Amino acid sequence: MPEVDRFGRLPWLWITVLVFVLDQVSKAFFQAELSMYQQVVVIPDLFSWTLAYNTGAAFSFLADSSGWQRWLFALIAIVVSAILVVWLKRLKKGETWLAVALALVLGGALGNLYDRMVLGHVVDFILVHWQNRWYFPAFNLADSAITVGAVMLALDMFRSKKSGEAAHG
């Protein structure tokens, strides 16, 4: 069995910090520059900047609830973040892909957790749409990092399964 060094893959936490900082800076910028639901078209019929607040989870799930969801989602984010840090610490030296994936998910989770705890909602500003017919729910850099990290985790599981290795975790 490969040896785990004292800190595992924790040095990859610089990615987590970078995601968190970029997420918070971008949210502060768009909050300062845009009014609520204002759209600034970047690519006509495809991509716009907008400012929206999400009190729910992904895709505004439970956003219309009375406020209890803020604490539920915060608790989930804290537990998941702790699990990700432990998982990251236990990784072996050759598991760089997995370390990057976990660091991305962790950075995104912490970015949205900060919003939820400090502001009471998550700040979203990226809007993908097709003409005026279809709109994907607004999202932010933290959501993007979580998505990219999750896709990387899925690819790692498929790669491990295909090569006959035990799945990580």
UniProtKB/Swiss-Prot annotation:
<keyword id="KW-1003">Cell membrane</keyword>
<dbReference type="GO" id="GO:0005886">
    <property type="term" value="C:plasma membrane"/>
</dbReference>
<dbReference type="GO" id="GO:0004190">
    <property type="term" value="F:aspartic-type endopeptidase activity"/>
</dbReference>
<feature type="active site">
    <location>
        <position position="143"/>
    </location>
</feature>
<protein>
    <recommendedName>
        <fullName>Lipoprotein signal peptidase</fullName>
        <ecNumber>3.4.23.36</ecNumber>
    </recommendedName>
</protein>
<feature type="transmembrane region" description="Helical">
    <location>
        <begin position="135"/>
        <end position="155"/>
    </location>
</feature>
<feature type="active site">
    <location>
        <position position="124"/>
    </location>
</feature>
<keyword id="KW-0378">Hydrolase</keyword>
<keyword id="KW-0812">Transmembrane</keyword>
<feature type="transmembrane region" description="Helical">
    <location>
        <begin position="10"/>
        <end position="30"/>
    </location>
</feature>
<dbReference type="GO" id="GO:0006508">
    <property type="term" value="P:proteolysis"/>
</dbReference>
<dbReference type="InterPro" id="IPR001872">
    <property type="entry name" value="Peptidase_A8"/>
</dbReference>
<feature type="transmembrane region" description="Helical">
    <location>
        <begin position="94"/>
        <end position="114"/>
    </location>
</feature>
<keyword id="KW-1133">Transmembrane helix</keyword>
<keyword id="KW-0997">Cell inner membrane</keyword>
<feature type="transmembrane region" description="Helical">
    <location>
        <begin position="68"/>
        <end position="88"/>
    </location>
</feature>
<feature type="transmembrane region" description="Helical">
    <location>
        <begin position="41"/>
        <end position="61"/>
    </location>
</feature>
<comment type="pathway">
    <text>Protein modification; lipoprotein biosynthesis (signal peptide cleavage).</text>
</comment>
<dbReference type="Pfam" id="PF01252">
    <property type="entry name" value="Peptidase_A8"/>
</dbReference>
<keyword id="KW-0064">Aspartyl protease</keyword>
<keyword id="KW-0472">Membrane</keyword>
<comment type="function">
    <text>This protein specifically catalyzes the removal of signal peptides from prolipoproteins.</text>
</comment>
<comment type="similarity">
    <text>Belongs to the peptidase A8 family.</text>
</comment>
<keyword id="KW-0645">Protease</keyword>
